[in-house]
Amino acid sequence: MPEIDVGSQIFDVVFHPTFATVYTGLLNGHVKAFAYNEQGKEQAAFSVRPSKRSCRGLSIKHDGTHLYAVGKAKALKYNFISGLIIRCSVIDTATAQISTRPGAHDSTINRVKYLMPWLISTGDDDGVIKLWDPRQQECVREYTQHFDYITDFLWLDDKKQLVATSGDGTLSVMDVRSKKPEPFAQSEDQDDELLSIVAIKGHSKIVVGTQLGILSIFNRSKGWGDCVDRVPGHPLSIDALCNLPPGLPNVDPTSTVLTGSSDGYVRAVQILPTKLLGVVADHGEWPIERIAVGGGWWVGSVGHEDLLRMTDLEGFFLDQSEDKELKGALGVTNENEQSDEDEEMDVLGNDAGHPEVDGSGSSSSGESSEDSEASDGETPQAKQRKRKIEQKPLDVDKPKGRNEIDVENAFFDEL
C-alpha cells in the first residue's frame, strides 16, 4: 500500500477527473498536489498556501481545471480591525494561481461541493449553506435550516437537488432551481449525527453514515421524511462514504460502497443485501476522515495523520475473488458460509430474537409471517432451516493497543 507523507494532518482529499493527480488539504493551510503512476509511485506536482489557517474542504471542477478550497483564515480589512474572515479560494490546477474571496461565511467552512458550471455550494460550522456563482461577488442563495455544522454534500443531477447532512441529526434537500431560501424537504431528527452521504442503486437510494456506526438508508420514492432501513455493524462512527468506480472486477459498484470508520478501517460493504466484502485499508489507531477514488482504480484515504494511503481497488477485489476460488478448490468454506451441520439452529419465524443484518429492514419479519401462514393448513411440519446467526457482520477484530488492558466489570463495582 503506497503511502504519501505530506508533512501535516490531512483534512480532505480529491482526485483529478482525468489525470493521475491527487490533491490534499492540510492543517497548516497548504494544498498539495501529487502525480502518481500505475504502481502508486508519487511525485510532488505543486504546493500552494491559500491561507495560514487550516484547509478544511476541497472540491474539483468537472473538467479538472479549477480546485475549490475552503477553511478558516484571518484577514486585515484596510486599516481597521483584524478579525476572523472565512475565505473561499479557487486554485488553477495547471498554473497553481490562486484567487481568494474573503468573507464568504461568518464561521469556519467545513465542506465545499462543485455542483455544475457556475454553481458551487459551501457549508459552515453554524449550519449555514450558501450557493455561489464564481462570476459574482455575493452568494446567490443562503439556507439556514440547520443549526449545527454541515458534514457532507450530495448532488442529484437528475432533479438539480443538493442534499446536505448535518450534525443536528437531519438532512435537507434544496432545489437549486428554486429561488426560495427554504429547503425542498428536510428529514425528521434521526437522533444521531449524520456524518457522510452517498447514493446507490442508480441514485434511487441514499446511504448516510452516522455517529453510532449505523448506515441509514433513504428511498427517494418514499420521500425524505425518515429512513426506510438501518444497517448496523460498524463499531464506531462512519465519518466517510465513497462510491466505487464502474468497471471493477467481481463487484457491483451500484450497490457497494467504501466506508471509513473511527476504528481505522476502510471497508468495502455491499448494501441490500448487506455483506462485508473485506477491509480495503487499515490506518491503525487513526480514525478515517475522508475517502476518495481516482483514476486507475486507486482509492485515497486519510485520517488524523500526515499520511495519504493509496490502495489499488482492482488488486483488492481480484484478491478477494482468488481467495474464494482457492477455498472452493480446496473444499474449505468461509465462516459465513459453513455447512448446515456446523451452524446453529434458527427456525424461520423466530428471527425476532436474533435479527440478521440484510439491508431489507422489516422484510425478514414479513417473510416469516408468510411462511407461518402457509404452514397453518398443513399437518406435517416443514423441515427446519438452519443458518448461522451473525451479531455484527461488519465488525472486524482489532489488535489490542500498546497500552490497552482488559478489565473485568467487577473491578468497577468497588469504586
From Swiss-Prot:
Subcellular location: Nucleus, Nucleolus
Biased composition (Low complexity): 358-367
SMART domains: WD40
Acidic residues: compositionally biased ranges: 337-346
SUPFAM superfamilies: WD40 repeat-like (SSF50978)
Biased composition (Basic and acidic residues): 390-405
CC terms in the record's Gene Ontology section: nucleolus
A Pfam cross-reference name: WDR55
Segments of this protein annotated with the region Disordered: 328-415
Residue windows of the WD repeats: 5-44, 104-142, 145-184, 189-228, 233-282
Keyword Zinc: no
Keyword Nucleus listed: yes
Family to which this protein belongs: Belongs to the WD repeat WDR55 family.
The protein's name: WD repeat-containing protein JIP5
Gene that this polypeptide is encoded by: JIP5
